[in-house]
């Protein structure tokens, strides 16, 4: 099944055949006809299409897509350019500036990170308009857990950045000692002062990659 268009299709072929995934596809196809669902249908698997399995150096986990009009663009924490920056993304940029002295961007599109090898993966891949977490029990987490497990199997070292309790739950899936796990509180305004600010995830990521002779990430938002 060619859903993504790169090596992820072969890696996830077994998941595509499972009943839970077939049920998601059936539900989603109907739901998009009946009511506003985000992200755009052709962007549901965009994080995977932009960052091939073999190119994944870093994984940043999000929850579910933004639920406002025109916001979600298939990448965790990212919004389309021209959309007001969500508070969590503003705080990510503040920490990036503090950590690597990268200027705070006015652009919200993180496609440039995805092309650098950062998989910006939401654990739930769709949401109803103005109803956060409305698709939480649809089965998406079975699929995204499988993605995390497949990355865990990689021989090449990978950095997993887990922000907030929902992301830290996934730590149990990351068992390969070659990988680095960076944890902190979520960049949301409600929790950013409880460990996110000052956690220096970006410099720690690049230090680890460099130590393993892997090209560092350019976190500049272009």
Locate predicted features:
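Short, conserved glycine- and acidic-residue-centered signature motifs
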Residues: 198
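A polyanion-binding, active-site-adjacent surface
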Residues: 2, 6, 14-162, 166-169, ...
């Amino acid at each position: 099944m060619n859903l993504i268009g790169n090596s992820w299709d072969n890696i996830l072929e077994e998941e595509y055949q499972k009943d839970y995934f077939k049920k998601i596809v059936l539900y989603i196809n109907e739901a998009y006809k009946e009511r506003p669902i985000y992200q755009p249908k052709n962007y549901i698997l965009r994080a995977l299409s932009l960052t091939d399995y073999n190119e994944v150096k870093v994984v940043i986990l999000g929850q579910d897509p933004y639920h406002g009009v025109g916001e979600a663009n298939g990448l965790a924490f990212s919004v389309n350019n021209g959309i007001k920056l969500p508070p969590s993304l503003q705080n990510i940029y503040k920490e990036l500036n503090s950590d690597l002295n990268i200027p705070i961007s006015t652009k919200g599109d993180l496609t440039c990170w995805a092309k650098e090898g950062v998989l910006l993966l939401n654990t739930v891949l769709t949401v109803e308009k103005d109803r956060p977490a409305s698709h939480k029990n649809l089965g998406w987490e079975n699929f995204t857990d499988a993605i995390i497990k497949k990355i865990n199997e990689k021989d090449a070292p990978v950095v997993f950045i887990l922000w907030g309790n929902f992301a830290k739950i996934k730590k149990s899936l990351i068992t390969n000692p070659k990988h680095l796990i960076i944890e902190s509180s979520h960049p949301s305004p409600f929790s950013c002062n409880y460990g996110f600010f000052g956690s220096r995830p970006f410099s720690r990521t690049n230090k680890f990659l460099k130590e393993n002779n892997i090209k560092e990430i350019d976190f500049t938002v272009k």
